[in-house]
UniProtKB/Swiss-Prot annotation:
Its main location: periplasm. One of its GO terms (cellular component) is ATP-binding cassette (ABC) transporter complex. The gene is lsrB. Belongs to the bacterial solute-binding protein 2 family. Keywords: Periplasm, Signal. It comes from Escherichia coli O157:H7. This is Autoinducer 2-binding protein LsrB.
Length: 340
């Protein structure tokens, strides 16, 4: 082999290796983080995110802490940033606790989005939102009103924690709607299960024992709602209306037995899918602005809205909210159509 030919082959080999290296580096990697693992709601969202990854040809990793904590989520965020992930999508356990880590991630060029539960808007680019507080808070009250159907009633609120962003926004709107439209309803207690199945069941049983004449439990949380239903069955209380948000697969037996007449949610699989599609669009296009639309396979079209739809004052370029197209009320007639 001549020296010239050897150099040519060596150069081509080096170029080939460089091209392969560039392709590896260019492959998108997206982290999808729940509040905690082991809960059906978050698993379903992760399934939707990973389905979107397959459709788009991007690598989506689903991982979260075993308990809902700021420190657990911060550790994961930092790990994903250090591993070179291009985008992070997180369901935040706190509106501000994750902000230092997320802002550092953005400074390093990582796209940061939220889903399910938001941070302060300045700590992310876009929030993939299941519904506005007014929509979801109103949904909770309307479901309860259809069953309580009386002017004077006693109502309890029961959900995950006093600090979680999304549920507290919904409950604030729900309580305002009760004050305006059902002034005879008395909110006798607001209690928390802290995303723990055992504690949630104990808390729900405690509510029912303490307020034997309770008319409704409003439980907008994937752990609290089934816990309230199970508590009612354990205590043989068939008079209290139990409404809230959880997944159809978890709530199916309670609906079939008549313990829960109706409950609500949104398609969390779609929410996970939309989140990854939006992150992918940002990585490819660089930015999106209010009014921009995005077509999502199997879902339809979504649009970027201003942060004001969530009641925020903060607005900035490359920052906004993407609302899910619809929310669902599940009952005995339609629950069989859903599997998540």
């Amino acid at each position: 082999m001549t020296l010239h030919r050897f150099k040519k082959i060596a150069l081509l080999s080096a170029l080939g290796i460089a091209a392969i290296s560039m392709n590896v580096q260019a492959a998108e990697r997206i982290a999808f983080i729940p509040k905690l693992v082991g809960v059906g709601f978050f698993t379903s969202g992760g399934n939707g995110a990973q389905q979107a990854g397959k459709e788009l040809g991007v690598d989506v990793t689903y991982d979260g802490p075993t308990e809902p904590s700021v420190s657990g989520q911060v550790q994961l965020i930092n790990n994903f940033v250090n591993q070179g992930y291009n985008a992070i999508i997180v369901s935040a356990v706190s509106p501000d606790g994750l902000c230092p880590a997320l802002k550092r991630a953005m400074q390093r060029g990582v796209r940061v989005l939220t889903w399910d539960s938001d941070t302060k808007p300045e700590c992310r680019s876009y929030y993939i939102n299941q519904g506005t507080p007014a929509q979801l808070g109103g949904m909770l009250v309307d479901m309860a009103a259809r069953q309580v159907n009386k002017d004077k009633a006693k109502v309890a609120f029961f959900y995950s924690s006093p600090t979680v962003t999304d549920q507290n926004q919904w409950v604030k709107e729900a309580k305002a709607k009760i004050a305006k439209e059902h002034p005879g309803w008395e909110i006798v207690t607001t209690q928390f299960g802290y995303n723990d199945a055992t504690k949630s069941l104990q808390t729900a049983e405690g509510i029912l024992k303490a307020y034997s004449d309770l008319d409704a439990i409003i439980a907008p949380d994937a752990n609290a709602l089934p816990a309230a239903a199970q508590a009612a069955e354990n205590l043989k209380n068939d008079k209290v209306a139990i409404v809230g948000f959880s997944t159809p697969n978890v709530m199916r037996p309670y609906v079939e037995r008549g313990t829960v007449k109706e409950f609500g949610l949104w398609d969390v699989v779609q929410q996970g899918k939309i989140s990854v599609y939006v992150a992918d669009a940002l990585l490819k296009k660089g930015s999106m602005k209010t009014g921009d639309k995005l077509d999502i396979q199997g879902v339809g079209q979504v649009e970027v809205s201003p942060n004001s739809v969530q009641g925020y004052d903060y607005e900035a370029d490359g920052n906004g909210i993407v609302l899910l197209p619809e929310r669902v009320i599940f009952n005995k007639e339609n629950i069989g159509k859903y599997d998540f």
